[in-house]
């Protein structure tokens, strides 16, 4: 047999190394090594919440907006601060905008490189969202800027239509990969992969389901909590999160093409989904997780959880993060 592996690891930030053991055209085993610095939250202990929040953007380059909003919501929950409906709407839009930017980047980098030049329009739109809504990125008790929220959101939703349309030549369900803009080389590769159905994926992560959330929180309170954040499971069973999991709560992914289509579907439906969120007659009051100091948000790569405990000086006593990558690259997870 032979082995092949990626070289994603960085000496400073770590990474995920996937080693594939194969014999001719059959994969015999997949080994996953995660060297990401999962104990980074130790830096937050005994620091004031304002300082911790200020550290978020520099510590987390990928999905930095998601990390910051998850942190804000966790701290607000721990401090008993209520997130108003307008702040929730603005933050949800920023989460949505960052997720879309990351998904489009993945699409044009990996599947449709001929559209790479159009990525700039999505980046510009995200920056516009940030400019219009950054008033919501402070603790809710200190926020002033809600008055013009609704018109700004309406305008951003209209702009998104023009941004997404040129990127996606086919929005029809079941369109061929070539019609969707997938490059010829990738189409051939996916056709070849289609002859070898994949095994069952890991179970679907759904932390809005109280049973899964409670099992996760119980593990975060156990002695091995730090290791759990590195290799999380639901009661010992690996789970998958991301665009495939969001759309296929009961189904399982047998073909790589199915997963590619789930990413494409989320991008094509983005304008419609943003519009329906914004045009709800009444902003719903934030539901949260119902657990003090805990927040769960959706990012491009999947579900992100922050859990914080504050001491009586309003400093961080304990901080825990479980990122989507740790679910999706569990040594016994879907990739295995």
Tell me the role of every PLM-derived stretch.
Residues 314:
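Mixed-charge (Asp/Glu-Lys/Arg
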Residues 304-306:
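A short beta-strand signature within small-molecule sensing/ligand-binding domains used
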Residues 1-301, 325-336:
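Active-site bordering "gate/hinge" segments
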Residues 319-320:
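Acidic, carboxylate-rich catalytic segments that either coordinate divalent cations
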């Amino acid at each position: 047999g032979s082995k092949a592996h990626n070289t994603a690891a960085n000496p400073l930030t770590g990474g995920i190394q996937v080693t594939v053991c194969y014999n001719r055209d059959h994969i015999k085993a997949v080994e996953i090594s995660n060297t990401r610095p999962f104990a980074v939250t130790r830096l937050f202990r005994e620091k004031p919440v304002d300082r911790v929040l200020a550290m978020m953007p520099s510590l987390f380059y990928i999905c930095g907006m998601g990390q910051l909003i998850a942190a804000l919501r966790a701290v607000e929950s721990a401090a008993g601060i209520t997130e108003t409906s307008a702040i929730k709407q603005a933050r949800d839009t920023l989460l949505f905008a960052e997720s879309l930017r990351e998904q489009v980047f993945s699409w044009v980098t990996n599947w449709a490189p001929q559209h790479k030049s159009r990525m700039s329009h999505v980046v510009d739109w995200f920056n516009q969202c940030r400019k219009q809504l950054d008033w919501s990125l402070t603790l809710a008790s200190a926020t002033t800027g809600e008055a013009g929220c609704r018109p700004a959101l309406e305008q951003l939703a209209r702009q998104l239509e023009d941004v997404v349309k040129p990127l996606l030549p086919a929005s029809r369900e079941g369109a061929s990969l070539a019609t969707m803009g997938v490059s010829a080389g990738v189409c051939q590769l996916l056709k070849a992969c289609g002859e070898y159905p994949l095994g069952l994926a890991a179970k679907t992560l759904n932390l809005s389901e109280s049973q899964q959330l409670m099992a996760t929180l119980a593990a975060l309170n156990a002695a091995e909590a730090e290791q759990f954040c590195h290799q999380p499971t639901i009661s010992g069973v690996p789970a998958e999160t991301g665009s495939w999991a969001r759309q296929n709560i009961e189904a399982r992914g047998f073909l790589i093409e199915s997963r590619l289509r789930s990413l494409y579907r989320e991008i094509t439906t983005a304008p419609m989904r943003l519009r329906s969120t914004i045009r709800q007659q009444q902003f719903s009051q934030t539901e949260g997780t119902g657990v003090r100091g805990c927040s769960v948000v959706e990012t491009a790569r999947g579900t992100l959880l922050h859990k914080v405990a504050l001491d009586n000086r309003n400093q961080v006593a304990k901080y825990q993060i479980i990122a989507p990558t740790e679910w999706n690259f569990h040594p016994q997870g879907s990739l295995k």
